[in-house]
């Protein structure tokens, strides 16, 4: 069986959905903007909360454990049970983590905030990659490249925004950035609607294509009799 046949929706069966590709790439930009914002805040957090370099390292560890190592687990689960709205759910975790980060007044609070921001990323990426492939219409290289450009742009944008709006200011200014995951939540909810519709169409087509099971011989004989 081909990989396309195993996927929830065979990408080559649909024309390239450029609108969805652009939307999921924009979602990737917004997600990675917040992901790259956290390391850019380390000098501010170190000064405002009097953190040691060891504590900064632990924040990075908590962030990377949830953002990176948890991703394959999420991917395994969603391969078996696709979750169209996990895209928006991931952005929701990022939003909660960002708000907590803005008003954290202790090291444990920052640690939890970093873990939540990382968790949002790990939930977002597996299904976002799947959506990019589904919307590719068979142009997998183009779709993946466009999706990756969004993420790379976000990684570059986060530190720049931190330097412009947060550096040399109060930690609470981080709250200004809640607009980013809020926009992302709305955008990815709409992508989730499209994803859910594609899954429903695929399942309906699979049911129509399934061969009709023959009636048991006993039922046939009973009906004739």
Predicted features and spans:
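Conserved MFS/SLC helix-loop-helix module at the cytosolic interface between two early adjacent transmembrane helices
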Residues: 69-108
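Flexible cytoplasmic inter-helical loops of multi-pass small-molecule transporters
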Residues: 177, 190-214
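Residue-level signature of mid-helix packing/kink "hotspots" within the transmembrane helices
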Residues: 36, 64-72, 155-156
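Cytoplasmic helix-loop-helix junction between adjacent transmembrane helices
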Residues: 113-150
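Juxtamembrane cytosolic amphipathic helices that cap and anchor the N-termini
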Residues: 13-24, 213-225
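Extracytoplasmic
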Residues: 23-43, 51-53, 74
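Helix-loop-helix hairpin linking two adjacent transmembrane segments in secondary transporters
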Residues: 147-194
């Amino acid at each position: 069986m081909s990989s396309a046949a195993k996927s929830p929706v065979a990408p080559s069966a649909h024309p390239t959905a450029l609108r969805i590709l652009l939307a999921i790439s924009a979602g990737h930009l917004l997600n990675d903007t917040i992901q790259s914002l956290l390391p850019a805040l380390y000098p501010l957090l170190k000064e405002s909360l009097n953190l040691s370099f060891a504590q900064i390292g632990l924040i990075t560890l908590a962030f990377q454990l949830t953002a990176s190592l948890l991703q394959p687990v999420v991917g395994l689960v969603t391969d078996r049970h696709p979750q169209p709205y996990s895209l928006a759910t991931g952005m929701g975790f990022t939003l909660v983590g960002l708000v907590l980060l803005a008003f954290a007044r202790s090291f444990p609070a920052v640690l939890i905030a970093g873990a939540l921001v990382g968790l949002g990323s790990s939930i977002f990426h597996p299904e976002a990659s799947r959506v990019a492939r589904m919307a590719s219409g068979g142009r997998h290289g183009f779709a993946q490249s466009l999706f990756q450009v969004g993420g790379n742009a976000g990684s570059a944008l986060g530190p720049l925004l931190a330097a412009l709006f947060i550096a040399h200011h109060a930690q609470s200014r981080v709250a200004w950035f809640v607009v980013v995951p809020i926009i992302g939540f709305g955008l990815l909810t709409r992508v989730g609607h499209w994803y859910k519709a594609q899954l429903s169409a695929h399942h309906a087509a699979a049911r129509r294509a399934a061969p009709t099971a023959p009636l048991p011989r006993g039922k046939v004989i009973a009906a004739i009799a």
